[in-house]
A protein has these predicted regions:
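Short, tryptophan-glycine- and acidic/Ser/Thr-enriched carbohydrate-recognition patches
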Residues: 1-4
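Secretory/extracellular carbohydrate-interaction modules
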Residues: 7-79
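Short structured motifs
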Residues: 26-31, 84-89, 159-161
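Extracellular/lumenal carbohydrate-interaction signature centered on repeated Trp-anchored short motifs
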Residues: 31-42, 90-97, 167-172
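Short tryptophan-centered beta-strand motifs in secreted/extracellular beta-sheet-rich domains
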Residues: 44, 96-107, 112-114
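Short, aromatic/His-centered strand-loop micro-motif at the edge of beta-sheets
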Residues: 80-102
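Short strand-turn-strand beta-turns centered on an Asx-Gly dipeptide
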Residues: 115-119
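Flexible glycan-contacting loops in extracellular carbohydrate-active proteins
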Residues: 124-174
Length: 182
C-alpha cells in the first residue's frame, strides 16, 4: 500500500522502492503487510540520497496500524529510535551509502534489538504495547495528529508557503525480509 501525493512520490527506481519528498506539509508512505507475528525478524536495506535534510520514519505496527517501535533518519545524518518521550541514537548514516537494518522484536516482552550493517545489536524497549505486528511502514515525515477533536471548526489562517516545494529528499528501499521467530 502506498500514499503518493504530487510532491511526495513513491515509485520503483533501479530495482528499489524510492520515496521522495519535496512537500513542506505532506509525506510519501509505503506500507508492507507480512504474516502476523508475536516474535519477528525484519531486515531491510536502504540508501538515503542526502544526510542534511529530509526525514524517514520506519515503524512496525499491528493490524490496526498502531506502531510499537519507530526508527528515524533525521536531517542531521542520525539514526534514532523512539524510547518513550525521548529519542535514542543508534548511529549515523551517510548520503548515497547503503545500510542494512536488522530488527528482532518480541511483542510479548516489548523488547527489540536493532543492528546496523551487522553491528552488535542495540537493546531497546517498544514505546507502545501491541499483541503482535503485521506491517512495516516507511514514511518521509511525521504522522499527522491534526486536526483532532479539539481543533476549532472555523479556521482563520492558512498554512505558510504551501505552493513552494522544499529541497527534495530521496530514500531507496533495496529489499525487505521478514521472518516469524519461534
Amino acid at each position: 500500500n502506498i500514499f503518493s501525493p504530487l510532491w511526495c512520490k513513491v515509485e520503483t527506481f533501479n530495482q528499489s522502492l524510492q520515496l521522495s519528498d519535496q512537500d513542506p506539509y505532506d509525506y510519501a508512505k509505503a506500507e508492507r503487510l507480512f504474516p502476523e507475528s508475536k516474535k519477528v525478524k525484519v531486515e531491510f536495506a536502504f540508501t538515503a540520497g542526502q544526510q542534511d535534510h529530509g526525514t524517514l520514519e520506519i515503524e512496525l505496527t499491528d493490524g490496526k496500524g498502531m506502531p510499537c517501535l519507530r526508527i528515524m533518519l533525521d536531517s542531521t545524518g542520525s539514526i534514532l529510535t523512539k524510547q518513550g518521550y525521548r529519542n535514542k541514537s543508534l548511529g549515523k548514516y551517510k548520503a548515497n551509502e547503503k545500510m542494512i537494518v536488522t530488527i528482532e522484536l518480541n511483542a510479548a516482552s516489548r523488547f527489540y534489538t536493532v543492528s546496523l550493517n551487522g553491528s552488535k545489536p542495540a537493546n531497546n524497549i517498544c514505546f507502545a504495547p501491541v499483541a503482535s505486528v503485521e506491517r512495516i511502514v516507511f514514511r518521509t515525515g511525521r504522522i499527522r495528529h491534526f486536526p483532532d477533536a479539539e481543533t476549532p471548526t472555523d479556521q482563520s489562517y492558512d498554512l505558510f508557503n504551501t505552493e513552494v516545494p522544499v529541497k527534495n529528499a530521496r530514500y531507496s528501499i533495496h529489499y525487505l525480509k521478514t521472518k516469524t521467530l519461534p
